[in-house]
Design a protein with these regions (language model features):
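Short acidic (Asp/Glu) patches
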Residues: 7-16, 46-50
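Solvent-exposed strand-to-loop "edge" motifs in beta-rich extracellular domains
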Residues: 5-11, 34-36, 110
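A short beta-strand element within beta-rich, extracytoplasmic domains
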Residues: 1-9, 125-131
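Extracellular beta-strand ligand-recognition surfaces/modules
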Residues: 26-29, 85-86, 90-91, 95, ...
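Extracellular beta-strand elements of beta-rich domains used
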Residues: 127, 147-149
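Short coil-to-beta strand junction motifs in C2/discoidin
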Residues: 20-27, 141-142
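Short loop/turn motifs that connect adjacent beta-strands in outer-membrane beta-barrel proteins
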Residues: 14-17, 117-119
């Protein structure tokens, strides 16, 4: 299980997370997983040498993005318009979520990985935080705290 708390300080513009150029979000927590040739698709395995040239041999294979933003519903899973099938975005809070309040999130990353990619991950490679407002021209201010892994 992965849990954390986050909050946004201002209302974000609704955006379509599935479309390049319209995919802004207030904040996202990314969980990356090591590349696994045994569970990777044919195209992932074919692209891997190029990924390693650009990003290095320790570049992750797949990502789950837990997102605050978009106009979908909490729990919706969307394929990344930039990374395609190797990055599944899961809406935790949409653009109508409360502003200025800490929101607790808890998710089963193993179940999410299996739902997104059809396999069970062996370990996590990285946790990353990001925000994106270049398409809508907005300004995001978000905080994230108490990121923690725990047994189910």
């Amino acid at each position: 299980m992965l849990n954390w708390e986050w909050r946004i300080e201002n209302r974000v513009v609704e955006s379509d997370l599935s479309v390049k150029g319209e995919d802004d979000r207030a904040v996202a927590l990314y969980v990356t997983f090591p590349y696994d040739p045994d569970t990777a698709s044919f195209s992932e395995n074919m692209m891997r040498p190029f990924v390693e040239i650009v990003r290095g041999t320790d570049a992750p294979g797949r990502m789950l993005s837990y997102v605050w933003g978009g106009f979908g519903n909490p729990g919706d899973m969307i394929e990344s318009p930039f990374f395609g099938a190797v990055n599944a975005m899961i809406i935790c809070q949409n653009s109508r979520a409360p502003v200025g309040e800490w929101v607790y999130e808890e998710t089963n990353i193993i179940a999410d990985h299996e739902r997104a990619f059809g396999s069970i991950p062996t370990k996590v490679a990285h946790i990353l935080l990001a925000a994106d407002s270049d398409d809508t021209g907005g300004k995001n201010r978000a905080s994230v705290r108490k990121i923690m892994f725990r047994a189910k």
